[in-house]
């Protein structure tokens, strides 16, 4: 991060299927944030299938100061995003706790790759419709969901959601930043790389080379991230953000 001029980052958990691994990983994420409070905003890993235990873990990590939840990975954790009996209580809990929620979404077309999964943009849109007050981040450009925001009824449901750019290199031309910023607003795009899978430096250079207006670039590279987790995150510099996945 220092080498690439990155002031702060979201440290996201992995979507473990074993709740005990989630608990262990969360202990680590709590420790990271406590050691480097100006550099990292940690997001908890949760197994929704754990039911009441998952909700108890949410309360625990919120009490420890973690700033979000995710990345949920339905395809790897054994449930579907439209399993409402499983997801509704968890999303309601994150909303009540004031925690943003990051969810892995897959493209329904295109090439296959390890970890792609089958989490559809349709289910993502339906989830957002069911929880209009939740702060949801659809990872990996939402599996192409922002392009459907040209449909007014889709845009209306998604107006409070965010998209992160993790793994763009493997999915889209980098013009996707400009296109989504124009269609959906730069205020809803979060810079993310999927580090350490992709290195931050080259990714950041490509984004800066796009010629985005400076206000839009500042929103994408950090201002949106700070607003998402709240002003209590005293990120060093408060200008540049990144998505760091451990």
Task: Tell me what each language-model feature is.
Residues 1-8, 179, 183-190, 197-246:
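Mid-to-C-terminal alpha-helical segments outside catalytic/metal-binding sites
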Residues 2, 57, 127-130:
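A generic "structured core" feature
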Residues 67-68, 73, 81-190:
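Catalytic pocket-lining loop regions of alpha/beta-barrel enzymes
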Residues 1, 29, 33, 61, ...:
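Conserved, mostly hydrophobic/aromatic
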Residues 10-13, 45, 137-140, 164-166, ...:
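Short beta-strand segments
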Residues 48, 144, 196-197:
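Short glycine-enriched loops at secondary-structure junctions
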Residues 23-27, 121, 148, 201:
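Short, surface-exposed alpha-helical segments at coil->helix boundaries
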Residues 7-8, 16-109, 113, 171:
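Active-site gating/metal-coordination segments in enzymes
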């Amino acid at each position: 991060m220092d080498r690439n001029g990155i002031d702060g980052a979201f440290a996201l958990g992995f979507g473990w299927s074993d709740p005990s691994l989630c608990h262990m990983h969360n202990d680590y994420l709590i420790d990271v944030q406590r050691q480097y409070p100006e550099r990292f905003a940690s997001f908890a890993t949760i197994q929704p299938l754990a039911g009441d235990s998952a909700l108890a873990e949410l309360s625990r990590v919120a009490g420890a100061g973690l700033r979000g939840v995710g990345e949920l990975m339905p395809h790897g954790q054994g449930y579907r995003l439209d399993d409402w009996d499983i997801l509704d209580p968890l999303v309601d809990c994150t909303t009540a706790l004031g925690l943003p929620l990051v969810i892995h979404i897959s493209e329904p077309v295109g090439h296959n790759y390890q970890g792609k999964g089958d989490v559809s943009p349709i289910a993502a849109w339906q989830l957002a419709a069911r929880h209009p007050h939740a702060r949801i981040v659809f990872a990996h450009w939402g599996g192409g969901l922002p392009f459907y925001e040209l449909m007014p009824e889709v845009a209306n449901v998604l107006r409070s959601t965010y998209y992160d750019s993790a793994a763009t290199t493997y999915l889209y031309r980098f013009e996707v930043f400009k296109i989504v910023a124009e269609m959906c607003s730069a205020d809803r795009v979060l810079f993310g790389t999927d580090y350490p899978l992709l290195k931050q430096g080259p990714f950041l250079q490509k984004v800066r080379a796009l010629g985005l207006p400076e206000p839009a670039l500042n929103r994408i590279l950090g201002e949106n991230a700070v607003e998402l987790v709240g002003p209590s995150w005293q990120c060093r510099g408060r200008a540049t953000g990144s998505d760091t996945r451990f």
